[in-house]
Amino acid sequence: MKPKFDGYAAQYDAWFMENENLFQSELRLFQKVLGDIQGKRVLSVGCGSGLFESMIDCSGIEGIEPSHDMGAIAQKRGVNVIAFGAIEDADLEENAYDVIYLNGSSSYMEDLTRAFNVCKKALKPNGKFISLDVPKESAFGFMYLLAKEAGTFDHPSLSGVMPKLPYPLEL
């Protein structure tokens, strides 16, 4: 099965660049919750193209990404992609990571409970687990679910429904 984002890596980054104010808002939130990661072992689950990681010092950040297209870009940006595949199927070292985060990737996981259990096992005692995502109960989350069912955001039935500014502009 072809990963969901293969063939869409360029569009993913382009969307954030076209919506720079939204990108900057999300980036500030990302930086705030991530905190100081110097000297820590960090894993990005669903690292995508490494766009957010490239805006911070991503040296040392490891990543797991189902899409080879996205992961290849992440590697070029400095993320050490340790696996191409779903977190649910990953065989991670126990108690290995100080920080594990999911930045917008949990809504694409087939088995969220299993994914979180894999992360829990790999997290060091007193480690930090971060999940940044759009709640499925929110208006934008509902749009994601509709687009997922339709197979695209470009489906005619979703025309004119997407909000222009889906994220908060200020944190």
Whereabouts are the PLM-identified features?
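Conserved class I S-adenosyl-L-methionine
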Residues: 1-37, 39-48, 51-55, 70-73, 130-157
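Class I SAM-dependent methyltransferase SAM/SAH-binding core
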Residues: 48-89
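A conserved beta-strand element that flanks and buttresses the S-adenosyl-L-methionine
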Residues: 101
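Short catalytic micro-motifs in class I SAM-dependent methyltransferases
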Residues: 104-105
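A short glycine-rich, Lys/Arg-flanked "PGG" loop and its adjoining helix->strand segment in the class I
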Residues: 113-125
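Short alpha-helix
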Residues: 164-171
